Amino acid sequence: MRTAPMLQFPLDEYEQRINNLYSVLEKGGFTAALLTNEDNLRYFCDYRSALWNNEYESPAMLVAVPGRLVLVTSTRTVQTALATCCLDEGDIFAYDGFGEAACPEALAPAIVDTLRKLGAVSGKLGTEIGPVTRMRITYNDRAAIFDALPGLESVDVSMDLLGLRQIKSPREIDVMRQNCRIAVDAFKIAADKVVLGETTEEDFYHNYAAASYDLGADDFSLQLVVEFGPDRMQPNGVAGPRVYSDPDWCIFADSGPTLKGYASDMIRMAKLAPPTAEQQRLMDIVLGCHALVVPMIKPGTTFKEVVEASDNYMREKGADGFCMTIGLLGHGFGQDVHEPPMITLSTEGCFKKGMVFTLEPTLLHPTEGQFAIENNYTVTEDGCELLTPQLQGFYIPERS
């Protein structure tokens, strides 16, 4: 392994991740694994390329066997691999036309040749075919690989890999802590720029994105959800041309930027006028839910316990009829905005040290609109740390 010029973590970070990958292969009895998704390539070797945004091309794939990991890419993009990827040059296999839209016939033979070179011609081939993943490969290419190597059997390895990625290292948590702060600070900057009768939802989005980059973020994995007014209850809707035309309207924003490939996912709310009594009552219900369940969370607390407590609280407050998060209170996140574990009544398992997750109690009131505060947390030795401490409740910009 080598320290590539653009490598984003120290080499020992990737060494540990790759060793964990080898352990998964050995424990599961896998002959090899074929990894095609951007998140996995970035996680295990830091390979990066703008071509991931092109749905018609596959810039690179990883093939792993116990004790060795190789990157398969095109001869035209070897320099990209050498600039970003931690693997030695001898572990970068380049093939003419690999993954290129103009040479679709090149991909499957390149993967077959790589597997043969690594001695992986029979047994279990780990592939990304789990319930929350999919392979970045066409059906025909996948069929061609297994036609050429009939001794291989496709078996899901994605959930094992997501299990590795659930537990963040201290370095990952440091990056996510920084990015989560950027996410909320950018909301404040965008809210401070709202002008009654002029600012649109799209303007807010643009101001938020500009502030995020100015504060140090480097990308977005999802569009920012922006909603003005009580009649715009569109969970995960996109910003539109609506103008902020009533100071009693709420400003609602959801998601956040990324930093070094790691997401943030906050919800914050603002207004240009103080909240009405009913708006404050609804916000207090949301904040009370966080106050109730967060002290419960520590290593060993089950997801079900936390969701049951939240659901019972919403019933006691008479909000269960318009609470969107009954039965589902949050989710893990990392390189993706939504990753396991899902924090639901039906999710087996418990919180573990190093998990990073959101809690987003959300009310969809029929006349008042959408109310939520989504906070980001990480599980510590004996509790959890709030990664988004700023702006709890309504933010009211000061006007001179």
Model-identified regions with their sequence ranges:
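Active-site neighborhoods and metal-handling regions in enzymes and metal-associated proteins
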Residues: 1-400
